Swiss-Prot record:
Coiled coil: none annotated. This is UPF0231 protein Sputcn32_0682. Belongs to the UPF0231 family. It holds the Pfam family UPF0231.
Length: 124
């Protein structure tokens, strides 16, 4: 999993871009997490607790995307994917899940999160 962090010099916004099959992680970092150091630390603390065996799993529901982490992996998915099965869209109308959901190993996610934290701290 490759990623790149940038900051728009005109608007000051922070942007994360992740490799193919992980694009939604970039959206989550950029839009749901953003440059909020307290929120970044909250997620890091939860990852640390899970890796230490103090917690089984953790979830952070955002406005558009949700993060779920457990002992094995991190999953980010669009909240719209959580709709009730009886209301599923027809095949022709189905969502492109590859851009709406991504998984990565928990250690890889932690490393990306630490890199994001460092990037944001330097940019503020």
């Amino acid at each position: 999993m490759e990623y790149e962090f940038r900051r728009n010099s005109l608007t000051g916004t922070f942007l994360a871009t992740f490799s193919m099959d992980h694009e939604v992680l970039g959206q989550w970092f950029s839009e749901e997490l953003g440059p909020e150091l307290a929120k970044i630390q909250q997620v890091l603390d939860s990852v640390t607790e899970i890796l230490a065996g103090k917690r089984e799993s953790w979830q952070l529901i955002g406005s558009d995307l949700t993060l779920e982490i457990d002992r094995e992996q991190a999953r980010v998915y669009a909240n719209v994917l959580g709709f009730d099965e009886e209301y599923e869209l027809e095949d022709a109308m189905s969502l492109y899940d590859a851009e709406s959901e991504a998984y990565c190993g928990l250690e890889d996610f932690e490393q990306a999160l630490l890199s994001w934290q460092e990037f944001v701290q330097k940019g503020i």
